[in-house]
């Protein structure tokens, strides 16, 4: 995969938005500089998830941004998304790779060096490490120390993104950590002005990511 796709990775969250507002937020983020979108829907039926994924993919395709589906291999394949992202309570990494084939992107959430190395060996294309900071979207998620993040980036040959409570104000924390990008939820999805927020994040990232110039 292209590691530059991971610079500013939007992970969606519906909050109380209706579908039109939700889609408009994704479109605004895509138009203004996010580089990848993950559709994460835990509560929808399979049919509703499929139909929403189709609508989101129309947006990401318009801006030529990869769409990743959280957890659901079936939805990923049904809408021909760029790939799927799985956590440690989903299908095993090797099985997921077998199901999606060699060409789709496979992202895996990890919290330790050991699980990171194992995920890469089993076929992960990139890793999401965190939660780095406390996060409202996963209130009980344990915090992963920056030292662990650095150790993971040093040990694996695939790109790593930091996730969990990432905000414009704490991006400086990630200097010299070796990450390829950051995954952000509420800082974008709940921003009063998404266009301005995404542009500000991209500007701030130029001082953080060594290859974002």
Curated annotation (Swiss-Prot):
Q: Which CDD domains match?
A: TMP_TenI (cd00564)
Name its pathway.
Cofactor biosynthesis; thiamine diphosphate biosynthesis; thiamine phosphate from 4-amino-2-methyl-5-diphosphomethylpyrimidine and 4-methyl-5-(2-phosphoethyl)-thiazole: step 1/1
SUPFAM superfamilies this protein is in?
Thiamin phosphate synthase
Q: Which residues form a coiled coil?
A: none
Instruction: Spell out the reaction equation it catalyses.
Output: 2-[(2R,5Z)-2-carboxy-4-methylthiazol-5(2H)-ylidene]ethyl phosphate + 4-amino-2-methyl-5-(diphosphooxymethyl)pyrimidine + 2 H(+) = thiamine phosphate + CO2 + diphosphate; 2-(2-carboxy-4-methylthiazol-5-yl)ethyl phosphate + 4-amino-2-methyl-5-(diphosphooxymethyl)pyrimidine + 2 H(+) = thiamine phosphate + CO2 + diphosphate; 4-methyl-5-(2-phosphooxyethyl)-thiazole + 4-amino-2-methyl-5-(diphosphooxymethyl)pyrimidine + H(+) = thiamine phosphate + diphosphate
Kindly give the InterPro entries that the UniProt entry links to this protein.
Answer: Aldolase_TIM, ThiamineP_synth_sf, ThiamineP_synth_TenI, TMP_synthase
Q: Which GO terms describe its biological process?
A: thiamine biosynthetic process; thiamine diphosphate biosynthetic process
Family indicated by similarity: Belongs to the thiamine-phosphate synthase family.
User: What protein name does the entry list?
Assistant: Thiamine-phosphate synthase
Q: Which UniProt keywords are given for this protein, alphabetically ordered?
A: Magnesium, Metal-binding, Thiamine biosynthesis, Transferase
- Species, as recorded: Lacticaseibacillus casei (strain BL23) (Lactobacillus casei)
* Ion transport is among the record's keywords: no
Q: Which domain of life is it from?
A: Bacteria
Binding annotation for 4-amino-2-methyl-5-(diphosphooxymethyl)pyrimidine: 38-42, 70, 109, 138
> Which positions in this protein are listed as binding Mg(2+)?
71, 90
Cofactor(s) the protein needs:
Mg(2+)
Name one cellular component (GO) term. cytoplasm
**Chain positions recorded as 2-[(2R,5Z)-2-carboxy-4-methylthiazol-5(2H)-ylidene]ethyl phosphate binding sites:** 135-137, 165, 185-186
Which gene does this sequence derive from? thiE
């Amino acid at each position: 995969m292209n590691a530059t796709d991971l610079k500013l990775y939007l992970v969606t969250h519906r909050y109380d938005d209706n579908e039109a507002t939700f889609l408009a937020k994704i479109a605004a983020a895509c138009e203004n500089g996010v580089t990848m979108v993950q559709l994460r829907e835990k509560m929808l039926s399979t049919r509703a998830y499929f139909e929403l994924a189709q609508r989101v993919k129309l947006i990401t395709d318009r801006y030529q941004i990869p769409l990743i589906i959280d957890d659901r291999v079936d939805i990923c394949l049904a809408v021909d998304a760029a790939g799927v992202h799985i956590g440690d309570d989903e299908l095993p990494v090797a099985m997921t790779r077998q199901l999606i084939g060699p060409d789709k992107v496979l992202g895996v959430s990890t919290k330790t060096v050991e699980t990171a190395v194992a995920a890469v060996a089993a076929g992960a294309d990139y890793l999401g490490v965190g939660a780095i900071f406390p996060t409202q979207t996963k209130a009980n998620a344990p915090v992963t120390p920056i030292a662990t993040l650095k150790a993971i980036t040093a040990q694996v040959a695939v790109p790593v993104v930091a996730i969990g409570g990432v905000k414009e104000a704490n991006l400086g924390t990630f200097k010299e950590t070796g990450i390829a990008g950051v995954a952000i939820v509420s800082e974008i999805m709940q921003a009063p002005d998404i266009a301005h927020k995404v542009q500000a994040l991209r500007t701030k990232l130029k001082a953080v990511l060594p290859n974002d110039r």
